[in-house]
Design a protein with these regions (language model features):
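Active-site neighborhood of HAD-like aspartate-dependent phosphohydrolases
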Residues: 152-194
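A short, conserved beta-strand element in the Rossmann-like catalytic core
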Residues: 5-6, 30-33, 129, 161, ...
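Active-site metal-binding loops of divalent metal-dependent hydrolases
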Residues: 26-30, 201, 282-283
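Asp-based, Mg2+/Mn2+-dependent phosphohydrolase catalytic module
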Residues: 212-215, 219-233, 243-279, 283-316
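Substrate-recognition element of Asp-dependent hydrolases with the DxDx(T/V) motif
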Residues: 181, 185-221, 231-244, 290
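Residue-level signal for inorganic ion chemistry
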Residues: 15, 29, 68, 92, ...
Length: 316
């Protein structure tokens, strides 16, 4: 907590004490639905970082950093340039050389210095952008943000749908994507679907593998999919089973399919277009779970991409 106002720049000074290295900074009054990996990759060697930019067309009354252009990833000013600051930044720790413990503006003082020295990069994005920094936009926020994030969802079982089910899959060696999965997940993302994994993982409760092993495997899956610009929005798992060895997991739970508590929790936390949402599974318990939550259901077929494409066509 600041003892005195330090501005958008001076407030960052407190991070210096925490020995921060690379970091992402987001303005609190903007929504910019971008791929952060693309922003990170846009930074060139021997620069401080990179700024996410948006075309300044419907934001004429916006007073944020503007009149910007990009040349070979390096950011500069130009009188008639159409790009403006989108409020998301990737910085190296070297940024702290330019941040003092005083009231100072990031956009009006620090960033202009970096731009003039040609040591800051920029990356243009065309994704959804909304700034509540003006009274007019603030009044529009609820309706526009709800509309943007109101999307259908694909609820997917994991073993037997995402990967081949070899029984209690919990390491990289045994994990293998089923045919069409990567292409199908990319297709779902392109068509603005949330992607949720809902999986029974009794192996955790039975001590066949650890929770840490489960998490490590999903980090591995995440790394593979990120290279394809695919992002799983949520992974829900149920470690419960009546025959579990670990006491806290030895019980019946509505999170375990055919119970539908995993799905119901997701429904409460996300703005979902349920009429176009669906579930793919490989067990009758998946089908029962989907029915309880009012979701269209199909058993996994031979090719995930073909199946996902067919379901989306059906929903149009």
């Amino acid at each position: 907590k600041e003892k005195k106002l330090l501005g958008t720049g001076g407030a960052l000074h407190s991070l210096k004490k925490k020995k921060v290295k690379d970091f992402i900074l987001l303005n609190g009054d903007t929504i910019f639905d971008i791929n952060l990996n693309d922003l990170i990759k846009s930074k060139k060697k021997n620069t401080i970082g990179s700024i996410a930019l948006i075309k300044n067309n419907s934001n004429k009354d916006n007073k944020k950093l503007n009149n910007l252009k990009i040349s070979d990833n390096i950011l500069s000013y130009s009188k008639n340039a159409s790009l403006m600051n989108g409020g998301i930044y990737y910085f190296k720790k070297d940024i702290f050389k330019y941040i003092q413990n005083k009231n100072i503006s990031l956009e009006n003082e620090i960033l202009p210095e970096l731009i003039n020295k040609k040591i800051i990069c920029g990356k243009k994005f065309n994704e959804f952008f909304f700034d509540i920094g003006t009274p007019k936009n603030f009044l529009k926020a609820d309706k526009l943000l709800y509309k943007h994030f109101f999307k259908p969802a694909a609820f997917l079982d994991r073993d037997g749908v995402i990967n081949f089910d070899k029984g209690y899959v919990h390491n990289k060696k045994d994990f293998k994507f089923r045919p069409g999965v990567v292409k199908g997940l990319k297709f779902l993302s392109k068509n603005k679907y949330y992607i949720f994994i809902v999986t029974n993982q009794a192996g955790i409760g039975k001590k066949i593998f650890s929770l840490n092993s489960f998490i490590k495997l999903h980090l591995h899956i995440k790394q593979i999919l990120q290279k394809e610009n695919i992002f799983i929005d949520n992974v829900s798992y149920s470690p419960f089973h009546p025959d579990a060895i670990i006491k806290k997991y030895k019980k019946n739970s509505s999170t375990r399919k055919p119970g539908n508590l995993m799905i119901e929790k997701i429904k409460k936390e996300w703005h979902l277009n349920l009429s176009k949402s669906f579930m793919i599974g490989d067990q009758n318990s998946d089908k029962i779970c989907a029915k309880k939550s009012g979701l269209y259901f199909e058993f996994a077929n031979k090719n995930f991409f073909s199946q996902a494409k067919s379901i989306i066509k059906r929903n149009q």
